[in-house]
């Protein structure tokens, strides 16, 4: 797996040996970033369930100012840190080794993110729903911020009523949900 575009284009990314992560394919990343590209320059990115960091690293490579990666798996965090070093993007990032819900419970209150990736395990729709509905996420998203949730097309999470589904993109067995808060004062 490689970075597709930007300053780290072509750099190889490693994935955890133990498995347990499901990195976004080139096709998924190409589609996703074609849609969010206009918002990337100077953006602050939050990559939840980051795995090896493919989404956040791609965002940094394409011009995001900073990325915070949240991942609980030790092997995934190790691969993520290695990927940030390999791509020379570590200085513009923070890696939080934690459960996403625990991070949102305690975490990003003083930060506002322009772009959030929510890429939980497909088998756990409940964790996707808990994350999207979490007050900690709501307070961490900038007013014009965008949340991109990745899910299996047959197992979509219920989207909270305070989020607007701005766009849905189906790619093979997956769907990308592009979400914004309905009330612009709802986010930070």
Set out the residue ranges of the language-model regions.
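Class I S-adenosyl-L-methionine-dependent methyltransferase catalytic core
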Residues: 1-188
């Amino acid at each position: 797996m490689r970075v597709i575009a930007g300053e780290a284009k072509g750099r190889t990314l490693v994935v955890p040996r133990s498995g347990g992560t499901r990195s976004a394919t080139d096709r998924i990343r190409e589609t996703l970033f074609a849609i969010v590209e206009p918002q990337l320059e100077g953006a602050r990115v939050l990559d939840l369930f980051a795995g090896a960091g493919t989404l956040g690293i791609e965002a940094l490579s394409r011009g995001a100012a900073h990325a915070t990666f949240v991942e609980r798996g030790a092997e995934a965090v190790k691969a993520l840190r290695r990927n940030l070093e390999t791509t020379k993007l570590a200085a513009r990032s923070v890696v939080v080794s934690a459960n996403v819900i625990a991070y949102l419970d305690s975490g990003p209150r003083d930060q506002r993110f322009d772009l959030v990736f929510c890429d939980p395990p497909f088998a756990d729709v409940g964790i996707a729903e808990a994350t999207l509905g979490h007050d900690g996420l709501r307070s961490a998203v900038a007013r014009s911020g965008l949340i991109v949730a990745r899910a299996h097309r047959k197992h979509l999470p219920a989207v909270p009523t305070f989020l607007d589904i701005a766009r849905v993109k189906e790619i093979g067995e997956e769907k990308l949900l592009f979400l914004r808060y309905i009330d612009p004062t709802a986010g930070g």
